[in-house]
Amino acid sequence: MARRQPAANATGEQAASDAGEDVPYVDADAWSLAVRGERELTLSFDDLKQRPRAEATVTMECAGNGRARLEPRPVSQPWLLEAVGTARWAGTPLRPLLEEAGVGESAVEILFTGLDRGVEGEIEQNYQRSLSIEEALRDDLLLAYEMNGGPLPPQHGYPLRLVVPGW
């Protein structure tokens, strides 16, 4: 989730998706988001943009920050400590979508799957992360479609990126 930029660059350019995967091409008109709980919600990009909007300035650090110092060195972006940045994100809050889909507190965790793919251990796979239900139901989580006042760039997860402040 990072690119080579100075630490804490105010433009947020260093918060790009880069877990070693190629940046996928996405046609937003054909793309949709599925949220599965007791009910399944399928939302188009336009549907998401019609929902209530929220903004947040968030500093993020790539999970792979510092991996250039690992032995043996992994095949990936050779980050030292520069994979940190701050950006202004805009999108729709996650919690109402989870509630509409019937994802409740009886769930243990929520798995988020990106379109970016990579190879780990000779197995091709999509980038995935999970959050506990407690974390996922926080009010400050955003499904962001804008970054710093413009559309979310492809290298930052276009058309949609989960933003979890403090994670």
Segments (PLM) and residue ranges:
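Structured, non-membrane catalytic/scaffold regions adjacent to prosthetic-group chemistry
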Residues: 1-167
